[in-house]
């Protein structure tokens, strides 16, 4: 028995002869390539996650204004599947720390992060969130990575919406390359989640090798 997939436009012209089939036989392999997708489960899960990152609606300072601008029609963040702003951390898997993090605000941020869905990601946006910025004082946390695992750092004071969107694209690339996007693996001591490497530690050697530094005017462009 031989068969193939066909469309109405594939029907041969003219009357059908006795004993002939009106379905054109193009070969099983050719039709299978058009309608069958072969992949691995972890690649499919990673592809779905990187294109449906749901950020939590949270802001601290002027950097939040730049992040909110990226949702407007001029920048159209919906192109990357991250336009679904959630009002509850229990429905989000991304939090953007945009602004100055004070000592009194750190426990609140930690609690919001703990309530987020897993796997969850953190983007540190702006100089204040990255390293405290110009506020080198007792009341400001000198970098949100002191108490939260940061996946992407977006520099600037404040960074433009384009910079935030580039950081989001870098995060999507990292999510798509995860070898085990299901997070939990079977280890020698039972089911556990492997520890993720810090992006700051991975890129430290490259930053230390830099010999040419740009001027502040070039950085803002």
Swiss-Prot record:
The annotation note on the cofactor reads: Binds 1 [4Fe-4S] cluster.
Primary localisation category: membrane
What cofactor does this chain's UniProt record say it requires? [4Fe-4S] cluster
- Asked if the record carries the keyword Iron, the reply is yes
Q: Name one GO cellular component term.
A: plasma membrane
User: PANTHER family under this entry?
Assistant: NADH DEHYDROGENASE, NADH DEHYDROGENASE [UBIQUINONE] IRON-SULFUR PROTEIN 7, MITOCHONDRIAL
Could you tell me what reaction this enzyme catalyses?
Answer: a quinone + NADH + 5 H(+)(in) = a quinol + NAD(+) + 4 H(+)(out)
Q: Which residues form the signal peptide?
A: none
Q: What is the name attached to this protein's record?
A: NADH-quinone oxidoreductase subunit B 1
Q: Which family does it belong to?
A: Belongs to the complex I 20 kDa subunit family.
Q: Species lineage, top-down?
A: Bacteria, Pseudomonadati, Pseudomonadota, Betaproteobacteria, Nitrosomonadales
Q: List compositional bias (Basic and acidic residues) regions by residue number.
A: 195-204
Q: Which biological process terms from the Gene Ontology are attached to this UniProt entry?
A: aerobic respiration; electron transport coupled proton transport
What does the UniProt record say this protein does? NDH-1 shuttles electrons from NADH, via FMN and iron-sulfur (Fe-S) centers, to quinones in the respiratory chain. The immediate electron acceptor for the enzyme in this species is believed to be ubiquinone. Couples the redox reaction to proton translocation (for every two electrons transferred, four hydrogen ions are translocated across the cytoplasmic membrane), and thus conserves the redox energy in a proton gradient.
Binding-site positions, [4Fe-4S] cluster: 62-63, 128, 157
User: What Pfam families is this protein classified in?
Assistant: Oxidored_q6
């Amino acid at each position: 028995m031989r068969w193939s997939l066909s469309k109405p436009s594939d029907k041969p012209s003219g009357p059908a002869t006795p004993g002939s089939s009106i379905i054109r036989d193009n070969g099983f392999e050719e039709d299978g390539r058009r309608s069958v997708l072969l992949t691995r489960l972890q690649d499919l899960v990673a592809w779905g996650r990187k294109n449906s990152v749901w950020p939590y609606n949270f802001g601290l300072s002027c950097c939040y204004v730049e992040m909110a601008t990226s949702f407007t029609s001029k920048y159209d963040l919906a192109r990357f599947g991250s336009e679904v702003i959630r009002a509850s951390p229990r429905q989000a898997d991304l939090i953007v720390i945009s602004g100055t993090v004070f000592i009194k605000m750190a426990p609140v941020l930690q609690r919001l992060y703990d309530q987020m869905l897993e796997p969850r990601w953190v983007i540190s946006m702006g100089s204040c969130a990255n390293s405290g910025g110009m506020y080198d004082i007792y009341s400001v946390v000198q970098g949100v990575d002191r108490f939260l695992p940061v996946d992407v750092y977006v520099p600037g004071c404040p960074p433009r919406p384009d910079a935030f969107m580039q950081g989001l694209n870098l995060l999507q690339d990292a999510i798509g390359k995860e070898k085990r996007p299901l997070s939990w693996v079977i280890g020698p001591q039972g089911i556990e989640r492997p520890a993720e490497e810090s992006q700051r530690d991975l890129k430290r050697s490259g930053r230390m090798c830099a010999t040419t530094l740009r001027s502040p005017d070039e950085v803002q462009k």
